[in-house]
Every structure is written in structure tokens, then in C-alpha cells.
Curated annotation (Swiss-Prot):
Residues 376-400, 502-519 have a biased composition (Basic and acidic residues). Positively regulates endothelial adherens junction formation and stabilization. Is thereby required for intersegmental vessel luminal membrane formation and stabilization during tubulogenesis in the early stages of development, independent of blood flow dynamics. GO terms for molecular function: actin binding; cell adhesion molecule binding. Residues 490-501 have a biased composition (Low complexity). It comes from Danio rerio (Zebrafish). Residues 306-448, 517-551 form a coiled coil. Residues 308-341, 376-418, 464-519 are annotated as: Disordered. This is Moesin a. It is found in: Cell membrane; Cell junction. InterPro entries: Band_41_domain (IPR019749), ERM (IPR011174), ERM_C_dom (IPR011259), ERM_FERM_C (IPR041789), ERM_helical (IPR046810), Ez/rad/moesin-like (IPR000798), FERM/acyl-CoA-bd_prot_sf (IPR014352), FERM_2 (IPR035963). Disruption phenotype: Morpholino knockdowns show intersegmental vessel and axial vessel tube defects from 39 hpf onwards resulting in disrupted blood flow. Loss of intersegmental primary lumen in intersegmental vessels at 32-33 hpf, vessels instead show a narrow and disorganized appearance without a visible lumen at 54 hpf. Reduces zo1-expressing tight junctions and cdh5-expressing adherens junctions along the length of intersegmental vessels during tubulogenesis between 32 and 54 hpf. Its main location: membrane. GO terms for biological process: blood vessel lumenization; endoderm development; positive regulation of early endosome to late endosome transport; positive regulation of protein localization to early endosome; regulation of cell shape; regulation of organelle assembly.
């Protein structure tokens, strides 16, 4: 039995190990990878490797893995990457797994500065990346420093602004909060919708020369072929949509593109190496096929995938809605519980106050009762004293009467008796005064006792009312593989004609996400203003200067596309030859 070969395939978020046979083809390995990761939108992807000369190359699916220029090491190393890009991510990327792989690959390209991204857009994209990873911002879980170990911005952007790590985090965190309620997969899609408007997104650049020998860049992307000047990879000068191209071929380093327009001459350029022409041909064939496929009705398989994805998304939305409803109910229950606890505390405090008031009232009542008893005793004593004085007065009256009688009978002792009578009269007068005084005192004590009794009755009534009010009831709460050609082959060609989609150039009518989406537009304007004060103008790169000039001129990716495709094919080819 032949000895197996170890293979390691690295996707954007996983590392896979396989054992393959020496006879295993590129397609068999590719199929094994996509099956393992559960990917169905396979036409965008390919397996990339470094050949023995150190060049990055795509694995040919129709050849044995071992027959290709793969470095003989163990394990054999491959990267599973997007080889072709969609025109519109929101229309073409169906599966969540596909969306995630594109999101991670595009994010890596932006962070590595392979795709130029202006600072304000970089911060906004970073906030979507944070939402995709951490979900909704939570101040209790996402404490200061929660992004300190994350690479979220290109190094160029960090160096161009006088902001420290904490200040960058603060800005990203503010926009992270703005995305509350957005699903992780929706955050990734929002990231891609903005990123696809970046000028360098999805473009494969190749160094070429025209017949004059001018050094230029050829850009191959989902929409066609574009020509760039040597010092500007962001603003194409001439464009050819796939619908204008009939045939592409190369002979050694010479590459020939035949337009559909028979009046137009061939579009000829020269590459530095034969292998570059092979790669250009493969990319042209793949991108052209996808371009035409998009302009035809969806296949049954794609229709099924879209229906399934829609069903899964709706199911997730329902689950999300249920979870959100549960969260709201839980928050409401917590609020109710807090309210009940607060009401309970308030009631307990009121009860304590009432009890304190009752205790004080009871003390006052007892004091008043004691005073009332004392006053009653005083009254009784005064009354007894008055009665005693009354008795003494009567006795004095009787004595006076007796003395008068004696006075009549004993005239002899008249002087003596008169003196005695005067004394008794004086004594009687004093006793009457004392009696009157005691009667007045008794009356005064009687009045005081009556008032105390009334106060006592009033206090009893108040106490009764307070006790009644204290009984408060608490509330009840409740790929078509595109062979780049054999290394021995120095020429190849491919027919690209497809009359059905010749006139469909809807991409020229597109608008950027910022132009369509007012919310994104506002966010970008706010970020531009916010970062302006911290920007170090001395650290601007060539791309920054080009971008700023494009913004000032009112140009964007799609307006530029319309402009560079204007005029007939012949005019544009002539323009290319003059560059």
C-alpha cells in the first residue's frame, strides 16, 4: 500500500490536517477541505501554496497534488483562501460560513494595508469587527482595556494619529455601542458592504508594460480589467468590462485580449514572467465565468442554498427575538423586584416611625395620667381642708352664739367678753378668708383636672388613629478550475464570449454603501471630524494623498468605473497604448 502524505490546510480561522494518497488530485483535496468545513459556495475559493521558487501559487485542481511545484516538506502546507470576489457581498454570499471566511480575509488585507482604507473608515470597520466578536457592548463585561490585545486598525492609521491605546479604544467602544442589537453575522456583512467600496478591494495587481514600454499595473477583479499608472493603485485610468472581451491568450510574456467590438484593435501588454501570464489567464477565466453567471438566473443549487439560508436567518431572528423578549422580561422582573424591595424598605421605615411616635405618645399619655392623678389628689386635699375649715367656722359660730348669750347674761364681764368677742370675730373673719381661699384653690384644681381629662381623651383618640393607620397592607407581587497551464506550455488562450450578458453592465450604476446608507454616511462624517484634530499631516502616505484628492474631486470607486469605461473600446485601447 502506498505511503500516505501529510497535508496541513490553514483556513482563516482553523487548521486542518489530512493524510492523502500520492495519486490524490487537487480537486480531491479541495473537496475534502470544503466538506470538512461545511462550505457549499466553493466557486470563490482555492488552495494556495508557495512553490519551490517562493512564489505564491494556486493549486491546480485537475492535477495530482504531488505532480505540482509544491515544496517537498512534511506536512505539505496550503492556505484555503478566496480566489475570486463577489460583485456585491449582500447579494452573492449566501452561507454564513462563506461570509465569515470573506470577512476574516478582507479584514486581514485591511489590517496588513494590502487594501488601503482611510482612517475614519478603518475605525468604523473596527467597531463592526468588535460587534462580530463580542456581540452587544456591556459596560459590566467590557471594562476599560477589553480591546487592548486586539489588532483592529492598520499600523499606518495608528502612526498617523496622536492617540494612545486607551484613546483608540474609547473611540471604537463608542461606535461599538452604536451597533446594539446587531447579530454577529449581520455585523460581518455590514463590514464587507463598506469594505467592498474600497478601491483596492478584490483586485489582483500585475506589473505589465504596453507596446511603448511604459510600466503600468493591470488590475483583475470581478468586474473586468483595469489599467493603473505605476504610482497609483487606487485610481484606474482605463477599464474594460468582462462583457467587452471575446478572447484572451498569451504567447510567452505577450498577452493578447481580443474585444467583442470587431472594429477595435487587440489589447496587447507584456508581463515580466511567463508564470504571471498563466496566472492572469486563470484569473480572467474564473472572474469572467462568475461575471456571466451572475447575469443569468440562479441554478437550482443556488436557489436551494438561498432558500435554506433565508430559512436559517429567519429562524435565528426568531430565536433572537425570543431571547430579547426573555431579556426584557428578566430586566422588568428585576426592576419590579427592586421596586418591591424599595417599597418594603419604605414601609418598614414608616412603620418604625409610627412605632416611635406611638411609643412617645404612650409615654406622654402615661405622664399626663400621672399628672391627672396628682391633680385629683390635690383637689381632694383642698376639699377636705375646706370641709375642715367649714367645721371650724360652724364651731366658731356656735362659740360666738354662746358668747353672745353669755354677754347678755353676764354683763358684768362685758369688757372681758367684748374683748373676747372681738377676738372671736377677728378669728371668724380670718377663717372665712381661709375658707374662701381654699374653695378658690379647690375650684382651680377642679378646672385643671377637667382640662387634663380632656387632653387625656384627645391623646387617646390620636393614639387610636395612629394605631389604625399603621396596619398598612403590603402589595401582592408577584472553482470551474482554471488551469494556469503546464510550466512547459508557453502559450494558451480562452474564449470568453457570452452574448446573453453583453449588455448587462449594471455594476456601472452602483453606489457606495456610504452613499446609499445615511447612517453609515453620518458615522463616517463624525469620525472624519473627530480624527482631524489628532492627525499628524507629516505622516501622510502616497495613498492618503491620492485618496484625499479623489474625495475632493467627488470621485468614488463606481463613479471612476463609469468614467474609465466611457467611449468605445477602440478609444480606450488607443488611450492605453499612449500611456
Amino acid at each position: 500500500m502506498p505511503k500516505t502524505i501529510s497535508v496541513r490546510v490553514t483556513t482563516m480561522d482553523a487548521e486542518l490536517e489530512f493524510a492523502i494518497q500520492p495519486s490524490t488530485t487537487g480537486k480531491q483535496l479541495f473537496d475534502q477541505v470544503v466538506k470538512t468545513i461545511g462550505l457549499r459556495e466553493v466557486w470563490f475559493f482555492g488552495l494556495q501554496y508557495q512553490d519551490t521558487k517562493g512564489f505564491s501559487t494556486w493549486l491546480k485542481l485537475n492535477k495530482k497534488v504531488t505532480a505540482q511545484d509544491v515544496r517537498k516538506e512534511s506536512p505539505l502546507l496550503f492556505k484555503f483562501r478566496a480566489k475570486f470576489y463577489p460583485e456585491d457581498v449582500s447579494e452573492e454570499l449566501i452561507q454564513e460560513a462563506t461570509q465569515r471566511l470573506f470577512f476574516l480575509q478582507v479584514k486581514e488585507g485591511i489590517l496588513n494595508d494590502d487594501i488601503y482604507c482611510p482612517p475614519e473608515t478603518a475605525v468604523l470597520l473596527a467597531s463592526y469587527a468588535v460587534q462580530a466578536k463580542y456581540a452587544d457592548y456591556n459596560k459590566d463585561a467590557h471594562t476599560p482595556g477589553y480591546l487592548s490585545n486586539e489588532k483592529l486598525l492598520p499600523q499606518r492609521v495608528l502612526e498617523q494619529h496622536k492617540l494612545n491605546k486607551e484613546q483608540w479604544e474609547e473611540r471604537i467602544q463608542v461606535w461599538h455601542e452604536e451597533h446594539k442589537g446587531m447579530l454577529r453575522e449581520d455585523s460581518m456583512m455590514e463590514y464587507l458592504k463598506i469594505a467592498q467600496d474600497l478601491e483596492m478591494y478584490g483586485v489582483n495587481y500585475f506589473s505589465i508594460k504596453n507596446k511603448k514600454g511604459s510600466e503600468l499595473w493591470l488590475g483583475v477583479d470581478a468586474l473586468g480589467l483595469n489599467i493603473y499608472e505605476q504610482n497609483d493603485k487606487m485610481t484606474p485610468k482605463i477599464g474594460f468590462p468582462w462583457s467587452e472581451i471575446r478572447n484572451i491568450s498569451f504567447n510567452d510574456k505577450k498577452f493578447v485580449i481580443k474585444p467583442i467590438d470587431k472594429k477595435a484593435p487587440d489589447f496587447v501588454f507584456y508581463a515580466q514572467r511567463l508564470r504571471i501570464n498563466k496566472r492572469i489567464l486563470a484569473l480572467c477565466m474564473g472572474n469572467h465565468e462568475l461575471y456571466m453567471r451572475r447575469r443569468k438566473p440562479d441554478t437550482i443549487e443556488v436557489q436551494q442554498m438561498k432558500a435554506q439560508a433565508k430559512e436559517e436567518k429567519n429562524h435565528k431572528k426568531m430565536e433572537r427575538a425570543l431571547l430579547e423578549d426573555e431579556r426584557k422580561k428578566r430586566e422588568q422582573a428585576e426592576k419590579e423586584k427592586e421596586k418591591i424591595e424599595k417599597e418594603k424598605e419604605e414601609l418598614m421605615e414608616r412603620l418604625r416611625v409610627i412605632e416611635e411616635q406611638t411609643r412617645k405618645a404612650q409615654q406622654e399619655l402615661e405622664e399626663q395620667t400621672r399628672k391627672a392623678l396628682e391633680l385629683e389628689q390635690e383637689r381632694k386635699r383642698a376639699q377636705e381642708e375646706a370641709e375642715r375649715l367649714e367645721r371650724e367656722r360652724r364651731l366658731a359660730e356656735e362659740a360666738k352664739s354662746a358668747l353672745l348669750q353669755q354677754s347678755e347674761s353676764q354683763m358684768k364681764n362685758q369688757e372681758h367678753l367684748a374683748t373676747e368677742l372681738a377676738e372671736l370675730t377677728s378669728k371668724i373673719s380670718l377663717l372665712e378668708d381661709a375658707k374662701k381661699k381654699k374653695e378658690d384653690e379647690a375650684l382651680e384644681w377642679q378646672t385643671k383636672a377637667t382640662m387634663v381629662q380632656e387632653d387625656l381623651e384627645k391623646t387617646k383618640e390620636e393614639l387610636k388613629n395612629k394605631v389604625m393607620s399603621s396596619h398598612v397592607t403590603e402589595p401582592v407581587h408577584g472553482e470551474n478550475d482554471n488551469d494556469e497551464g503546464d510550466e512547459s506550455s508557453a502559450e494558451a488562450s480562452a474564449e470568453l464570449t457570452s452574448a446573453a450578458a453583453y449588455k448587462d453592465r449594471s455594476e456601472e450604476e452602483r453606489m457606495t454603501e456610504a452613499e446609499k446608507n445615511e447612517r453609515v454616511q453620518k458615522h463616517l462624517l463624525a469620525l472624519t471630524s473627530e480624527l482631524a484634530n489628532a492627525r499628524d499631516e507629516t505622516k501622510k502616505t502616497q495613498n492618503d494623498i491620492i485618496h484625499a484628492e479623489n474625495v475632493r474631486a467627488g470621485r468614488d470607486k463606481y463613479k471612476t468605473l463609469r468614467q474609465i469605461r466611457s467611449g468605445n473600446t477602440k478609444q480606450r485601447i488607443d488611450e492605453f497604448e499612449c500611456m
